[in-house]
């Protein structure tokens, strides 16, 4: 009797674990995985499209700032010129330092051609002559910087600097650098975003950032040197071109189109401290520029203290004030299509 009753009772089926609703955490995890895979599949292009080389973007910002005087060059210009002091000596409202560490002549040409200064501005190009006359860019870093500065196809410039039009490889390299910078910025900023939701964490984050800012010093303003690699970064030298087939014609054309005054400065040279006083340029590039109405200021042989140099063309910070004063003297004295020698002031 007992066995027949128990046999007639219904038996509950075993529960199927897959039939239960998935926890919310699982769905969120799957959504996160899909998002990450989507970003990876897109090559982080959407994120990277808004990120630029900081060296290029800040130089562009300064050259288009509307400042009446602009310094354009590379780390040599950054080490030589104190923009605020130069503005005082020239009695102008502002001097913007738009130099880019590691820049060569094609980069300067790209800045002036694709990001023209305000009409009536004075553009002072200061870099060693062999850098200014550089032709084909020698390294991937140099090519990437040029591609970053271009806004439209520029056959004369890219043929000189790249050997032709911008290639897919150059664009891929640029996007790779942008993507890496964007992803790194997103990763490093994530803890701050999380901390912003927690007041206690936010206070600690702010304190940390304040301490870091105090250690690093103030961020450079519109007149200060651009951040980047230390002055004198070693580069593979580009082949020097004759003036007529270098970027000089492109620079002159860009200045004329922007209605800007162009002055080319030959920087201080530790090896040429005994250079003689001259009334005409000693090199072919200087003569070519003067013949086309461009002022040339030659600081070789100017009475600069020998211990002011840190390298061949670079100066210690302690030498910038004297160098800036000497440069201001030349910039005030030189006229259009004229040549001024700093050695004549000894």
Descriptions of predicted regions:
Residues 61, 243, 249-317:
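Extended hydrophobic/aromatic segments used for targeting, binding, or gating
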């Amino acid at each position: 009797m007992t066995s027949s009753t128990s046999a007639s009772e219904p038996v509950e089926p075993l529960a199927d674990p897959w039939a239960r609703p998935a926890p919310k955490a699982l769905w969120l995890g799957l959504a996160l995985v899909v998002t990450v895979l989507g970003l990876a599949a897109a090559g982080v292009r959407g994120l990277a499209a808004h990120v630029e080389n900081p060296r290029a973007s800040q130089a562009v910002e300064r050259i288009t700032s509307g400042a009446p005087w602009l310094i354009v060059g590379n780390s040599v210009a950054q080490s030589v010129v104190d923009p605020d002091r130069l503005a005082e000596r020239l009695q102008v409202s502002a001097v913007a330092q738009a130099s880019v560490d590691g820049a060569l002549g094609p980069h300067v040409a790209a800045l002036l051609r694709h990001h023209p200064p305000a009409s009536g501005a004075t553009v002072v190009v200061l870099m060693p002559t062999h850098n200014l006359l550089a032709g084909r860019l020698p390294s991937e870093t140099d090519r990437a910087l040029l591609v970053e500065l271009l806004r439209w196809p520029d056959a004369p410039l890219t043929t000189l600097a790249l050997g032709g039009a911008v290639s897919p490889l150059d664009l891929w390299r640029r996007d790779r650098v942008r993507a890496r910078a964007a992803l790194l910025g997103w990763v490093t900023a994530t803890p701050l975003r999380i901390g912003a939701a927690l007041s206690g964490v936010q206070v600690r984050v702010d304190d940390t950032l304040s301490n870091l800012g105090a250690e690093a010093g103030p961020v450079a303003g519109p007149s200060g040197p651009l951040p980047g690699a230390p002055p004198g970064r070693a580069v593979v030298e580009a082949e020097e071109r004759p003036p007529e087939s270098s970027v000089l014609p492109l620079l002159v054309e860009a200045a004329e189109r922007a209605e800007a005054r162009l002055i080319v400065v030959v920087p201080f040279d530790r090896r040429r401290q005994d250079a003689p006083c001259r009334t005409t340029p000693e090199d072919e590039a200087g003569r070519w520029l003067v013949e086309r109405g461009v002022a040339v200021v030659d600081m070789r042989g100017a009475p600069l203290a020998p211990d002011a140099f840190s390298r061949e063309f670079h100066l210690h910070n302690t030498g910038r004030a004297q160098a800036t004063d000497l440069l201001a003297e030349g910039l005030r004295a030189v006229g259009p299509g004229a040549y001024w020698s700093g050695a004549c002031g000894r």
